[in-house]
Amino acid sequence: MSANDKQYISYNNVHQLCQVSAERIKNFKPDLIIAIGGGGFIPARILRTFLKEPGVPTIRIFAIILSLYEDLNSVGSEVEEVGVKVSRTQWIDYEQCKLDLVGKNVLIVDEVDDTRTTLHYALSELEKDAAEQAKAKGIDTEKSPEMKTNFGIFVLHDKQKPKKADLPAEMLNDKNRYFAAKTVPDKWYAYPWESTDIVFHTRMAIEQGNDIFIPEQEHKQ
């Protein structure tokens, strides 16, 4: 993928992608959010604002960090390529966080569904963690389906390309479990939190049509 395919995404664009996705995600009724770092952190925080309901406790956000992308050249290079192996850099300490996944609706957030490798790994490992917690409590989720942990996924962009890993078909086919704010061509999407020159980045996003797309008069204060 060449630098000519690079699409700049502004903070405004990210904010509004979360805004337009929130109503659908409310149908999932997430009890907690798990953000995949670093791309999922800011979308998760913005999304939580739009999911907030009066009189209801704020949804907790937890962070995991996985390594998949590796820079193939020197610092400052414009070339980035997908790695082939996922490794944990940071995971949830369930005991310290007093976090119980059993019976919860858990929303996993990342910025992009690219090769799907990272999302597959995160979902698989979190499902294992939930199963272990249920087993430790003596809960059989087959006999008590209300205690099953339900996972959903939200991404800003789903790239239309062959994926290197799978997600469960029942998730992908359920509009209330898999949420992509926008389906996009297979290009290089540069997000604002990766930028070292946000003024240039924002100008490019505006020129490419990747900035504000909801008219101001539709905003709710």
From Swiss-Prot:
Write down the required cofactor(s).
Mg(2+)
Q: Name one GO biological process term.
A: purine ribonucleoside salvage
Query: Under which pathway is this protein filed?
Result: Purine metabolism; IMP biosynthesis via salvage pathway; IMP from hypoxanthine: step 1/1
**Highest taxon, organism lineage:** Eukaryota
For the keyword Ribosomal protein, the answer is no
Enzyme group, top EC level? transferase
Keywords of the record, alphabetical order, are: Acetylation, Cytoplasm, Glycosyltransferase, Magnesium, Metal-binding, Nucleotide-binding, Nucleus, Purine salvage, Transferase
| Reaction it catalyzes | IMP + diphosphate = hypoxanthine + 5-phospho-alpha-D-ribose 1-diphosphate; GMP + diphosphate = guanine + 5-phospho-alpha-D-ribose 1-diphosphate
Positions annotated to bind GMP = 85, 110-118, 159, 188-194
Q: What is its EC number?
A: 2.4.2.8
Q: How does activity depend on pH?
A: Optimum pH is 8.5.
Provide a GO CC annotation, any one: cytoplasm
UniProt activity-regulation remark:
Subject to feedback inhibition by GMP.
How is the co-factor bound, per the entry? The magnesium ions are essentially bound to the substrate and have few direct interactions with the protein.
Task: Please name the SUPFAM superfamilies in this protein's record.
Answer: PRTase-like (SSF53271)
* Role description: Converts guanine to guanosine monophosphate, and hypoxanthine to inosine monophosphate. Transfers the 5-phosphoribosyl group from 5-phosphoribosylpyrophosphate onto the purine. Plays a central role in the generation of purine nucleotides through the purine salvage pathway.
Any extra detail in the entry? Answer: Present with 36500 molecules/cell in log phase SD medium.
Tell me which family the UniProt entry assigns to this protein.
Answer: Belongs to the purine/pyrimidine phosphoribosyltransferase family.
What does the subunit section of this Swiss-Prot or TrEMBL entry state?
Dimer.
Record protein name field: Hypoxanthine-guanine phosphoribosyltransferase
Question: Which organism is this entry from?
Answer: Saccharomyces cerevisiae (strain ATCC 204508 / S288c) (Baker's yeast)
Q: What is the lineage of its organism?
A: Eukaryota, Fungi, Dikarya, Ascomycota, Saccharomycotina
Point out the gene that encodes the protein. HPT1
